[in-house]
Structures are given as C-alpha cells and as structure tokens.
C-alpha cells in the first residue's frame, strides 16, 4: 500500500499541478513496473504462471515439468557441475530455452528476480487493474467484458456516444457505447474486448454495483483510455447509470480531464497537462489502483468539478452499486484482491481530492465553502465510504472494472489525446473556480437527485451498506441524493445550516450503520489525511455524525452533546436493541474520545457500554446453570447404564433357573456396583461412558451371564450342586481374583485335566472337589468341568497343544469342550467377580483383561477360548491357564476331536460375545 499511500498523498497535495506531477512520476514508476509485465503478458501465460506460485510449485518451472517432485528443488548437487552454481538458472537445467518462468509470473520480466509477492492490494494493482484490459483478455477479460453490462445506465450509452465521438478515431470506444448499451441490456452477454468499453461497463457496474466506485477511477486513470472518464462511459455511466445519467455525460464532456484527475487524483486534470499526458501519468499507480479507479468512476459525475467529484463519486458509486449485483458475480473474485488497497486508497484519494477541492472552493467561496466543502466532504466521505464498503461487498466488480479499466486506460490514452481539449476545458472550468464547480455540482446534484427520485429512492430509506449490494445501492443512491440535496442546499444556505441539514439528511437517509461506518471511515481517513472536518460520532439511538470543523465552534458545542449521546448510546447498547449498527458506531465512538479528547468519563462509559453490549450480544448466559447441566448429563449416563442392564437381544438369553438366578444376582450386583462407583467416583459414574468402567461393567455382566448361562448349560447336577449360592460365594473371591486366576487356571487345569479325562460323573465328583478347592483356587476348573459334566464331550483332544498355555486359545476355540474357563467365571458370583478388593488391577486395566472372562478376552482375540457355552449348555472352556500340562491332560482324556460343528458354534459364540462386548 505504500504506493497507494503515496498516491493518496499526492492526490492530497493541494495544488493540482503538484498532484499531477506526482501522479505523473508515480505513473512512470508504475509504468516501469508494468511495462515488462505487459510484455510478459502479451503471451497469455498459463493461469498458473500468472498466479504467484513459488517457482518450485509451478508446473513447468524448471525440472518439474509435468511432475512436482516430492522434494523441493534440490540444486545441482548431483550432476556434473555439482556446484550447480548459477550456470543456468540456478538449477543448471534449462527446461525451456526461453526461461520466462524464472521470473515469478507476477514480476513479469522487468522486476528484480526476487520473487516479490505483492500484497493483495498491490497484486491487484499489479495490474489486474492496470492491465485490466489485458487481464480482461485473459480469463479476467471475460469478466471485464461481461462487465460491459455494467454500462447499463443510459448515461453509459450517452457516454459511450461521447466516447465514440472522442474515441471513434480510436475505434474501440465505438464498441464501447454499443457494448455499454448491450451491457446495460445483457450484463453478461457482452464481453466485448473494448477495454474502454469494458471499463466503462465496469464503471457502470461498479457504479451501479456498489463494488468499485473507484473503477471509474480506473477509467479516469491515465491508463484507462477512459481516464477521461467522460469518454470512458463507465464513469459517467456508473454515475449516470445509477444516479445522474445526464449529469455523468455532461460531466464527462466537461470533465474528461477532470475525470482523469478525479480518477482519484484530481491532479491529472488539475495538473492541466493534456489529458493524454495525464492519461499516461494518470494511469499512474495511484490512479490505476482501484481507489484511483474509484475516483475516476465517480469522476464521470464528479468530473464536473472536484466539488462535484465527491458527490458525483457518491452518485457514481450509488450508480455503481445499483448495478453492483450484476457486477458482483463477475468481479467478485477480483474484488478481494483490490478491495483492501482500493478501500484505503480510495478513501485517501477521496480525502485528497476533497482536500484539494476544499481549498479551492473555500478560497473562492470561503463563506459557503467552509461549511459547504466540509459538509460536502463529509457527504462525499459517507457516500464514498459507503461505496467503498459496497465495493467490498461487490468484490467481483472491482477486478472486472479494473480489467476494463486498463482497457479503458488505453482507449483513454487515445481518447485523452483527442480529449486534451476536454482537459483544458475542464481545467478552465476548474479555474473558473468554485463558481463553476458549484454550478456543475448543483447541476450534477440536481440531476442525480432527479435520477434518484426517478428511481424512487427515499432518503429516509435505511439500507445498510454492509448488508447486501442491492441495499447498498439503494443506500448509496439515497446517500448520493442526500449529498446532492445537501449540496444544492449549501448554495442556498449558510455553511452551518448546510452542515446541520446535511448531517440531518445524511443521517436521515442513511441508516445508523451508514452513519457509524461513514463516521468511522471519515475519522480514519481524516486521521490519515488531515481533513479539516473531524467527525464526532456521537451515537444516540441512531448514531449521529457530527462534523468537527476546527475553525467552527461547532466542536465545543457538540462535545457535551456527544457525551450525553454517548451515555444514551451506552444505555441503548445495554438494551441491545440496536445491534450491529450501533455496535459499529460504538467503535467509532471509542475512537472519538481520543479525537475529541473527551473526558475519561465518556471513555469509561464507552467501554462499559461496549462490555455490556458484547456480553449481551455475544455471551448470553444460558438459562441452565452448570449444576443443572451436569446433573442432566449424570442422569443421562445413569439411564444409559440402566438401559444396558436389560438383556440385549443379540445375546442369547438363557431361560433357565441358573439364568434367572444370575439375572437377579446381576441386578443386585449392578446395584452394588453402581453404589460403589457413585461412592468412589461420581465422575466415573457420570462417565458411565468412561471406557474402562463401561467395559468392566459389561465384562462383569457378561461373565455373570455366562456364569449363569454356563451354570444352566453346565447342565450336570454337579454344576448346579456346586453352583449353589454357597458355591458362588466360594467362587466369588476367586472369580474376583482374576490375578489368582492364572494360578487358579493352572490348578484348575491340573484338576480339570484330571476331571476332564474322567467321565462326566467322575468329572462332576471331581468338580465338586474342585469347587471346594476352588474356593481357594479355581472355580474356573469347576466351571469347565461342570460344563463338561453335563455332556461328556471329548475335550477337543484335537488340540493336544502342550505348550499352548494361554495361547492355546486359538485351538481352544475349537476346544469348545473345555468350557472350563467360562464355566469358572460363571460360577463366580458376579458381585464377587468384580469385587474391587480382589480384582487385580491387571484384570481391570490390562487390556481390560478379561482374564476372568478370559473367554471373552480370548474369544475376542479369536483365541477360541471356548467361550460359548451359552447356547446348548456348551462347556465353557477353561481358560487355558498357563499350564501346558493341564491342557495336555485335559485334552488327553478325550482322545476325541471335538466336532467341527462345535468349533463352528464356538466361533459363533465368540462372535456373539464380541458383539456384546463391543456394545
């Protein structure tokens, strides 16, 4: 933005000649910048080249032709000249004989080779705007041409004819007027390549589109042949398009140079060098920059006089904004790039124009000029700011307009040559002084007012620029109307009256948002460029902007009012009736205390009001207290856990006395478990979702169910006998002692091994013994055997895997016979099983170790620990303890291999269990 700032400063310079000279120098610098670029752009490079990708990522940059190497460009360390040196372009490999790509696409051939990345705004200025015609020819050109619809306003046609008159010598301008009319009729149909025309259309669309008030500035910009925006239909079109078609045309004719100068730098027109000269210089970076384009857009209307320029800018903007919607679609993508720079430059330039114009008008008409210019500046600021805002809104318009602007610049350069007379005439007009300006501005204002009235825009209508382009258009029109009206009134009224009326009208027709935004922007702009007017934005129910004129005592008189209004604002904000608008105005307001040096009290008031506003608007406390909220969570978790208690359909439901007993036990145990959890850690209870607890609880449930189901399955009386509550109690500790389980398993294996080989009856006997033993050791074994007792199935001798220990599980799956482990688990009372005292941590937390449920664990693991006893009284497999001997014995007894069917069923059961566990 340095460039744009310098531009703005130059335009700020009071003397037009000065600004013209500056603009000229600036334009030269920009020319340097862009000349190479234009050259490089003559061949339209691939889109990627136009983008600033670092070379390494660009497709055909160097070695990466067609393929991006996974590694960054790795110099030349690997070939012959390993230094790689700068032999060719650094890589030593010249992919293409002409290495255009060594330069980043944005730099073009001219600039230093360092990959200058431009700021968004500078990139845009980079010449989307300057070269807008060229870029328009590129994909952008379509947008710019499509922007020809922007020249929808009749004025655009008028101006098109004017430009044709001036440009018909140029030929392109002729296209422009038809294109303008076309674009008016077919916004997107005409993508004619006439840069001037496209630019005019852009200007129109920008004017109507609210997007780029400054696009007309582009037109006016020295490069855009429309730099004499009058010819460049877009500026006048834009202004006339929305507000004062005739006015724009008149202004275009009168102010063609003026428009150039208005292309944000009045300097070009003021400098008085021929429009052509100014055209080139006008196409200076500042003018070409979107902001400058904005002024030139306005300048069609503005061009009439610097005085009118702001109003007409506003008008042009409003006209832009009305068309902005159409423009928006096209230019939206380009807008973003330019919006930042343009908004800044545009505001600065406008400020500069106003400063320049204000001194002129003030010098000639000090009486009226003081109040008038300040007011007008304020109005212009409002309109300009709003238009600038709308520019932001219609992001598309900007680029398209820029593109077209560049085209127009070229036409405009030609037109400028033809229009030098216009420049001189405009210069004469300016020299004629505020009189002529005021006349023109009055005329332009009246025209624009008439145009607005034709459009039935009411000043009182509150449309928020921020909200949407159409609203912004209406607003801008209203604003322009208001500003024009005020301008007319200014001549009639004393400056103070004018000011007051202006403020009233401005604020009446512009919504609080406009006011606040304008006020903010004004204050910001004034801070940047010292304008004589200072805004005291005091927000009452509706933000009011007061212009603080240093010479005028308005300031002091307004200060108390502003403070009271601040208080009102604070209260209103607290009530949060006015939301965004006032919130924005508050920010302006906060800036005010510093600007106005208001008391700390007012500042505090602002801050308090802000805090309240933010709190109410953005941090509304929920109706539910934290306690209630978390209580609800806890309740939900409890309900969830209770729900889970209910038998799950996918599980096999054993309907057997053991199952019923188990169920009752399960319910009691769960109650106990819940109580424990609640006592110990409500957090965990809240988190029944907590994985560990959930898993543990489920495991318990399963093991209990298994125990019960297994008990039922272990149909043999031995199991039932031993499964008396006593047994459960006995086994409970053991089951709970999953840590003991390993040992228990070993014992159970040994015992089970003896038991398993034995017939079911012997097994049952043994099981009873074992169960007694297991009172210390392994109900696993008992369960396993009890399972078998009912069915003396060979315990998968099939697996005589001696070393298998736990790992035996794989075969254990087939080993459905040894349901021992599951059986064991079943036997343990569930309450006992999970008694935290006994439960070893390893069991609880080790892989959610289902060592109790080893069956589940291993079944999950596909280890085939016969988990499936559920259906058909299958035997629970004893979890393979670690004793290979036991496995050996166990399987030995049954020399028979279990049926494949059983294996399959075991697998099925495993699957079921897995499902259960997952759930």
UniProtKB/Swiss-Prot annotation:
Entry superkingdom: Eukaryota
Compositional bias (Basic residues): 23-46, 87-134
Positions of region (Disordered): 1-454, 468-499, 670-793, 809-839, 861-919
Record PTM N6-acetyllysine, positions in chain: 152, 330, 419, 435, 473
Residue location of crosslink Glycyl lysine isopeptide (Lys-Gly) (interchain with G-Cter in SUMO1): 578, 830
Cross-link (Glycyl lysine isopeptide (Lys-Gly) (interchain with G-Cter in SUMO2)): 188, 330, 411, 419, 435, 455, 460, 489-490, 499, 534, 546, 548, 565, 578, 591, 597, 620, 674, 777, 783, 830, 910
Modified residues (Phosphotyrosine): 218, 283, 381
Phosphoserine: residues carrying this PTM: 102, 104, 177, 181, 196, 198, 221, 258, 261, 263, 267, 284, 289, 296, 299, 314, 383, 387, 395, 420, 425, 448, 470, 494, 500, 510, 523, 529, 557, 562, 576, 646, 656, 658, 688, 759
Modified residues (Citrulline): 802
Subunit structure: Interacts with Bcl-2 related proteins, EMD, with the adenovirus E1B 19 kDa protein and with DNA. Component of the SNARP complex which consists at least of SNIP1, SNW1, THRAP3, BCLAF1 and PNN. Component of a MACOM-like complex, named WTAP complex, composed of WTAP, ZC3H13, CBLL1, KIAA1429, RBM15, BCLAF1 and THRAP3.
Function of the protein: Death-promoting transcriptional repressor. May be involved in cyclin-D1/CCND1 mRNA stability through the SNARP complex which associates with both the 3'end of the CCND1 gene and its mRNA.
Protein's name according to its UniProt entry: Bcl-2-associated transcription factor 1
Organism encoding this protein: Mus musculus
Gene field: Bclaf1
